[in-house]
């Protein structure tokens, strides 16, 4: 367990805020698989202030998800402050997180996301204003720098703490790296030595063993798991159990994966129209199929589906095939 200000996080495993992924349906599933803290996908400050319908729907929080962190992004201090005030007063979020790590050009070109990393003074100013304006804890997720010549992680981390941030999460890659190359865990260790607030490590945590290694090597307070949890909430469960007991639980069976995939879809359909939910679920279902023999053919079929019944039928036939024990010729998949 650790605390972000007065918010108790029951374990040291955090679900990362992934854009286009971390809606209520995915977050609740992650919570049920053991994540101590789940983070909502980033929302635009200006979209909140303009009362954009899609954005306002993204602010929905199921009480079962809590504790939950809701992330906002923006490049202008005044609009960030006003959006944070709205989140503070009108949502069930426990924590307000500031995005300073998104490397996508459409975000950075408006001086938001990781663009803030280039100005440590602005980092201090915006966080101080947010902290002064809301009652909920304010946290920050940042990358270690823009490129190898512009790494201001120590200044930015110190300024975040000095401005009143209650915790900091660090993805230890530069913006230029995007998701390539190896994450530099030494950065997390160095920041942790300097700060008193909780430091959450992020980057290349792809197994329970690596989660423990990050905790041991960097002394960070928690690990943040992102892409490794896509279609694989068992990664969260197995990591929590491994950190608690030192034992690795079994990988899920194909049937278990498909059952949870369909549960995920049903939850999406509770917050979105069926066709929209099914189309969104196509990418998630592809992740659930990863590692299952014959899953490549299913992935292609998924892109033709429009209803829950169609997806359930496809998966049912696939499971019947898998569980029949039929051996197919190499490179030939029969469903």
Residue map of PLM features:
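Flavin-dependent oxidoreductase catalytic cores
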Residues: 1-335
């Amino acid at each position: 367990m650790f605390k972000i200000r007065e918010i108790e996080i029951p374990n040291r495993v955090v679900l990362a805020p992934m854009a286009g992924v971390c809606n209520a349906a995915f977050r609740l599933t992650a919570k049920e698989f053991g994540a101590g803290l789940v983070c909502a996908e980033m929302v635009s400050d200006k979209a909140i202030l303009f009362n954009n319908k899609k954005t306002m729907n993204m602010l929905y929080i199921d009480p079962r998800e809590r504790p939950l962190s809701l992330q906002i992004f923006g490049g202008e201090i005044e609009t960030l402050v006003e959006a944070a005030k709205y989140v503070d007063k009108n949502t069930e979020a426990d924590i307000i997180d500031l995005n300073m790590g998104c490397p996508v050009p459409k975000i950075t070109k408006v001086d938001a996301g990781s663009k803030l990393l280039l100005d440590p003074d602005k980092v201090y100013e915006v966080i101080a204003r947010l902290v002064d304006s809301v009652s909920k804890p304010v946290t920050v997720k940042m990358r270690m720098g823009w490129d190898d010549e512009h790494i201001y992680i120590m200044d930015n981390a110190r300024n975040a703490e000095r401005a009143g941030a209650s915790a900091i999460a660090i993805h230890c890659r530069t913006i230029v790296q995007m998701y390539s190359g190896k994450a530099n865990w030494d950065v997390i260790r160095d920041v942790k030595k300097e700060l008193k607030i909780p430091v959450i490590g992020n980057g290349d945590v792809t197994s329970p063993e690596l989660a423990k290694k990050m905790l041991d090597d960097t002394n960070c307070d928690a690990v943040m798991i992102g892409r490794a949890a896509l279609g694989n909430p068992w990664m969260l469960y197995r990591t929590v159990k491994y950190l608690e007991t030192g034992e690795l639980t079994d990988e899920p069976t194909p049937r278990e994966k498909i059952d949870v995939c369909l549960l995920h879809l049903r939850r999406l359909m509770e917050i979105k129209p069926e066709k929209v939910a099914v189309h969104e679920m196509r990418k998630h279902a592809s992740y659930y199929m990863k590692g299952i023999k014959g899953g490549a053919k299913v992935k292609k079929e998924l892109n033709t589906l429009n209803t829950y019944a169609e997806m359930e039928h496809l998966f049912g036939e696939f499971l019947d095939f898998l569980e029949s024990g039929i051996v197919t010729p190499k490179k030939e998949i029969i469903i």
